[in-house]
Regions:
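Membrane-integral, polyisoprenol-dependent glycosyltransferases
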Residues: 1-348, 381-384, 560-562
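Membrane-embedded architecture of ER/inner-membrane glycosylation machinery
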Residues: 169, 287-598
Length: 598
């Protein structure tokens, strides 16, 4: 129920979030419309960067009868796989801790928790309330799906290790789905986790034998390889170069898309991704890495620690670094947070004094957690001092609307309530203190964060949807559609038309003029001025004020937010573009090799 509230409630009430989710949604909808479930395509071009599982799951929803009636913005279908994946992780964490309760570690020795259900719910909420999970668990990209498939796979593999009576093969089968979600990185992360854990336990050969790794990898390959093989047969070298060469090897070995980050990038990400429970995560990680081999059924803490380390080490080594790369570590973080909190309560269940069974490290972690919660609450109460500092040219009215909404003060109220619960538990022995702190944060998400999401959608995305509606009304049968300056793939999704995207540079105008005459893609044919004398252009205000765009004297048909809809005479466009080329100010660069385009 909590998972449904956190991830599914109001899922389709805000539109697609630019820039990446509309590309996923557009490719999935194209599969449903064309019946081609092999090759993802968006905006008239193949999309090779991700495997098909996310597109298949979205596409199944898009293919439902009357889909447009119950999901007019398309965001319910796009976000549902991520939401269900996140709920699946919550259920898997709960099921694992309920079936295999982990002993608490404390000065009084080890003992099993009296209420394992509490630890199970705390772990699920520690995962779900991660700022990264709250964001990526509701949007239409493949990161949450990878995280969910990998988490279920690893938990099933650990269960097979913990209980010899459990089947060994389900984990490998789900790992194949993880490979279909985002590629071979899933096998690498699973392998690093198992090797590190097996070495730490001093039982790597036994682990490998119990899990039947060789046969397991064959099962993984049987699930994943057929699609890759079919793509190589049908699409050939372009797919190999793009998916394996650029989106996997090159992303690991060199920086792409300007995502250059220092080697320590994921250390602050680790801290932020578990707020406000990061101190408990660090304590749980420390105890999970303690050099004490344990019985298989009691080794989940160590397994989670090596799971988290596998993600940290692998993506730290990668040249390209993004915050979303940390998402596969968040289920492990949820386990470590819950078990650290369980340790702190182990001595209290029999009425012992405050801190018994927990030790000073737990008291420090508990106090630091409450301090972080209080800090966030204070920062939200004084939001009037920092909200005016938000300057985003794409959302010029955000500051005023955020201040007037009252949603930030509502968020401050829930964080204050969580801080008060935490402070109370510092002074009195309260079983389940972390669950008591988590529940106000669930309310924060439901009653403050979701309304803030809706507000942001209205400021940032609604103007694009309004432009799309204007395009549908104004476009002529012969006209092409272009967007220049600020580029939003959701324009393609909401118009259902091929959009020629060009940036703010001088080359953008030259490219647009040349592409109208020469570029051919599915849904877009080249044309002469006689065949199509005008072109519809969606242009943002700042770009429209540049001298070379003012020279085309576009006829303004509509405006919404920062965007303008122009009808541009192609004769003027070609004349202005030719003048730029003759002056050496621009050139047609759209034919240059580019690893990513849409």
């Amino acid at each position: 129920v909590l998972g449904l509230g956190i991830f599914v409630l109001q899922l389709g009430e805000a539109g697609l979030v630019d820039e990446t989710p509309p590309l996923f949604a557009g490719a999935a909808r194209a599969m449903a419309e064309t019946g081609d479930w092999l090759t993802p395509r968006v905006n008239g071009l193949p999309r090779y960067d991700k495997p098909p599982l996310i597109y298949w799951l979205m596409g199944l929803v898009y293919a439902l009868p009357d889909h447009a009636r119950f999901d007019p913005l398309g965001s319910w279908a796009a976000g549902l796989p991520s939401a269900l994946s996140s709920i699946g992780v919550m259920l898997a964490l709960c099921a694992t801790l309920l079936r295999w309760p982990q002993p608490s570690l404390g000065p009084g020795g080890e003992r099993l928790p009296r209420r394992p259900a509490r630890s199970a719910v705390v772990a699920a909420l520690a995962f779900a309330l991660s700022p990264l999970v709250l964001l990526w668990g509701r949007i239409g990209v493949s990161d949450a799906l990878l995280s969910g498939c990998l988490a279920v796979s690893l938990l099933l593999l650990w269960q097979a290790w913990a209980d010899p009576g459990r089947p060994w093969w389900p984990g490998w089968l789900v790992l194949g789905l993880a490979v279909l979600a985002k590629g071979p990185v899933a096998v690498v992360l699973a392998g690093l986790t198992l090797v590190g854990f097996g070495w730490h336990q001093g039982s790597l050969p036994a682990l490998w034998a119990r899990l039947k790794a060789g046969r397991g990898l064959v099962i993984t390959a049987l699930v994943a390889v057929p699609w890759y093989a079919a793509m190589l047969v049908v699409e050939g070298q372009p797919f190999w170069d793009s998916f394996f060469g650029y989106h996997n090897l090159q992303r690991f070995s060199s920086v792409v898309n300007d995502h250059l980050q220092p080697w320590w990038f994921f250390l602050p990400v680790l801290v932020i991704a578990s707020l406000p429970f990061t101190p408990l995560l660090l304590l749980g990680l420390k105890r999970g890495l303690a050099r004490t081999p344990r019985a298989p059924q009691h080794s989940l803490r160590s397994f989670a620690a090596w799971w988290l380390l596998a993600v940290l080490v692998f993506f730290t080594m990668a040249a390209t670094k993004l915050p979303s790369y940390w998402l596969p570590a968040t289920p492990a973080a949820g386990l470590l947070i819950s078990l650290a909190a369980q340790d702190g309560e182990s001595g209290r269940r029999d009425g012992e004094g405050r801190g018994a069974g927990a030790g000073r490290w737990f008291l420090l972690a508990q106090a630091a957690t409450v301090l972080l919660t209080t800090t966030v609450a204070v920062a939200l109460w004084v939001s009037h001092t920092w909200i005016p500092l938000i300057k985003d040219p794409e959302m010029p009215t955000l500051t005023a609307e955020l201040t007037a909404s009252g949603f930030v003060e509502r968020a401050a109220l829930f964080w204050t309530l969580a801080a008060l619960v935490g402070l109370l538990c510092l002074w009195r022995v309260v079983p389940g203190w972390l669950l008591g702190l988590q529940l106000p944060l669930v309310a924060f998400h439901l009653f403050a964060l979701l309304p803030l999401w809706q507000l942001g959608d209205g400021v940032r995305q609604r103007p694009v949807r309004e432009m799309a509606a204007s395009v549908q009304r104004e476009i002529r049968p012969s006209e092409a559609l272009a967007m220049v300056g600020v580029l939003k793939p959701s324009l393609h999704y909401y118009t259902g038309r091929v959009v020629i995207y060009e940036g703010i540079s001088v080359d953008g105008m030259v490219n647009l003029s040349d592409r109208l005459r020469h570029e051919q893609r599915e849904g877009q044919q080249p044309s002469t001025r006689a065949e199509a004398p005008t072109v519809l252009v969606v242009i943002d205000h700042n770009t429209s004020q540049l001298p070379y765009w003012r020279a085309v004297q576009g006829e303004e048909l509509d405006r919404a937010g920062i965007y303008r809809l122009w009808r541009v005479d192609r004769a003027r466009l070609e004349s202005a573009a030719a003048a730029l080329v003759n002056r050496g100010a621009g050139r047609p660069s759209w034919r240059d090799p580019r690893p990513e385009r849409y």
